[in-house]
């Protein structure tokens, strides 16, 4: 960035996407301030790194700053945004600041409706073990780092590319990964899946002539846009037509392994501690990126062997009296199906008890029919009220109605508990040794699993 930019203020700094950028900027020597509605481990970490963190949004939070960065959850009526505009301080979206960081390095951007965080984390781990030492900005906490960001000394920056509002088009990566393309964020993409596909084509074609696109051939929508891709690309998947493919897949407990091939050549076995066939595809994308950067396959294997997973991605929170509590961020029907399938394939003999909190009224409305039929791998399903994420309620769109329709479509054991805070006591009454309890959703449902663990420990003691 131009040398006169020294002080940067983040509105909503505690968000997972904002905090990573703020941490990298702090490590680069910029003065960073920010505000958020509440204190968290994330805000505490940023404060310990030298960030000036305020709680609540107020015009007084905007001290002597050169630029204001906002998340997608922050609107024009925010008092800090209004004050910045009054003082003619530039107000930019998070993606634009990420684009500035990416201009300092060769960017590797991981895009797609699902799997971005896990794939980004895998790429970051593989490149680190390959000696590349990338700068990392992830939408989840990488367990081996204990954070979602790191300033590396190498030439590359690995980051998620958020398609939710089209702002990933501000990025200009050298390597672009697209894991899949699905219908989501339909409040923004009013043209539906065709508009979403068009936007991804634009994103892919932004890479330079010497860059590379890494594209999942298993995804129907990606396969459909391949003729429109104008830049060099490789494909990955399970099909023999994919450039990089997996065979001999094994899913055992929390471990996944497979044999990786490149254009017919057998490279070797990869194993990592994260369940689910969908994570095989994420791992193949990682291998494609690492191979493009000439990381030896042995070091790629080592990176996977030491991959510690990602916070809120099938994260085992604890086990008490034979009851395992797992948390996952999945909130789209496709993600839910994949996550439940991972649980069933890894532990076929264990009962899967799912506590689901729908995320956003708009998503629940647009994808209602898909939500109704995506829970069949759950032996027991409990729904709680929709996490609004700042949205106004939509008439007729409720978790209770969703639960009723899930039951009508053949799900046998479905319960609706309106108050999320009542869930731990309800779960305590129904769980038994051998169960896997999965809290599922992008809101605050993770607190339910932690509360249940405390109650189980008390009951055991």
Curated annotation (Swiss-Prot):
One of its GO terms (cellular component) is cytoplasm. ATP binds at residues 112-118. Pathway: Cell wall biogenesis; peptidoglycan biosynthesis. It is found in: Cytoplasm. One of its GO terms (biological process) is cell wall organization. GO terms for molecular function: ATP binding; UDP-N-acetylmuramate-L-alanine ligase activity. InterPro entries: Mur-like_cat_sf (IPR036565), Mur_ligase_C (IPR004101), Mur_ligase_C_dom_sf (IPR036615), Mur_ligase_cen (IPR013221), Mur_ligase_N (IPR000713), MurCDEF_pg_biosynth (IPR050061), UDP-N-AcMur_Ala_ligase_MurC (IPR005758). Pfam families: Mur_ligase, Mur_ligase_C, Mur_ligase_M. Its EC number is 6.3.2.8. It catalyses: UDP-N-acetyl-alpha-D-muramate + L-alanine + ATP = UDP-N-acetyl-alpha-D-muramoyl-L-alanine + ADP + phosphate + H(+). Keywords: ATP-binding, Cell cycle, Cell division, Cell shape, Cell wall biogenesis/degradation, Cytoplasm, Ligase, Nucleotide-binding, Peptidoglycan synthesis. PANTHER family: UDP-N-ACETYLMURAMATE--L-ALANINE LIGASE, UDP-N-ACETYLMURAMATE--L-ALANINE LIGASE-RELATED. Cell wall formation. Belongs to the MurCDEF family. This is UDP-N-acetylmuramate--L-alanine ligase. It comes from Geobacter metallireducens (strain ATCC 53774 / DSM 7210 / GS-15).
């Amino acid at each position: 960035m131009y040398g006169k930019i020294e002080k940067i203020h983040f509105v909503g700094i505690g968000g997972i996407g904002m905090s990573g950028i703020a941490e990298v900027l702090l490590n680069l020597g910029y003065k960073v301030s920010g505000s958020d509605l509440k204190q968290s481990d994330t805000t505490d970490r940023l404060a310990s790194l030298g960030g000036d963190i305020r709680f609540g949004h107020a015009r007084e939070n905007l001290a002597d700053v050169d630029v204001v960065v906002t998340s997608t959850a922050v609107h024009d009526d925010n008092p800090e945004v209004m004050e910045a505009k009054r003082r003619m301080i530039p107000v930019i979206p998070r993606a634009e600041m990420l684009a500035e960081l990416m201009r300092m390095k060769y960017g590797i951007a991981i895009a797609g409706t699902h799997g971005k965080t896990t794939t980004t984390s895998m790429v970051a781990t593989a490149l680190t073990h390959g000696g590349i030492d990338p700068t990392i900005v992830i939408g989840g906490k990488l367990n081996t780092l204990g954070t979602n960001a790191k300033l590396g000394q190498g030439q590359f920056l690995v980051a998620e590319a958020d398609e939710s509002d089209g702002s990933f088009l501000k990025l200009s990566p050298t390597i672009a990964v697209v894991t899949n393309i699905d219908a989501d964020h339909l409040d923004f993409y009013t043209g539906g899946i065709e508009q979403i596909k068009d936007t991804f084509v634009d994103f892919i074609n932004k890479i330079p002539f010497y860059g590379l696109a890494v594209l999942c051939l298993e995804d129907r929508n990606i396969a459909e846009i391949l003729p429109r891709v104008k830049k060099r690309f490789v494909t990955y998947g399970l099909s023999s037509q994919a450039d990089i493919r997996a065979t001999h897949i094994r899913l055992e407990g929390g471990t996944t392994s497979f044999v990786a091939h490149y254009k017919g050549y057998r490279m070797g076995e990869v194993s990592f501690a994260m369940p689910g066939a969908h994570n095989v595809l994420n791992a193949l994308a990682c291998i494609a990126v690492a191979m493009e950067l000439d990381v030896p396959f042995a070091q790629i294997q080592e990176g996977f062997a030491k991959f510690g997973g990602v916070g809120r991605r099938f994260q085992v929170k604890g086990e008490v009296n034979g009851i395992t509590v797992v948390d996952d961020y999945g909130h789209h029907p496709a993600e839910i199906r994949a996550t439940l399938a991972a649980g069933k394939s890894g532990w076929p003999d264990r009962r899967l008890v799912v506590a689901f909190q729908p995320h956003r009224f708009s998503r629940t409305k647009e994808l209602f029919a898909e939500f109704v039929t995506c829970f069949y791998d759950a032996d027991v399903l409990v729904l709680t009220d929709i996490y609004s994420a700042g949205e106004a309620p939509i008439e007729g769109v409720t978790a209770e109605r969703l639960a009723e329709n899930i039951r009508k479509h053949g799900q046998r054991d479905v319960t609706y508990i309106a108050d999320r805070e009542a869930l731990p006591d309800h779960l305590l009454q129904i769980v038994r040794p051998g169960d896997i309890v999965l809290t599922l959703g992008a809101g605050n449902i993770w607190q339910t699993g932690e509360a249940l663990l405390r109650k189980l420990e008390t009951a055991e003691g």
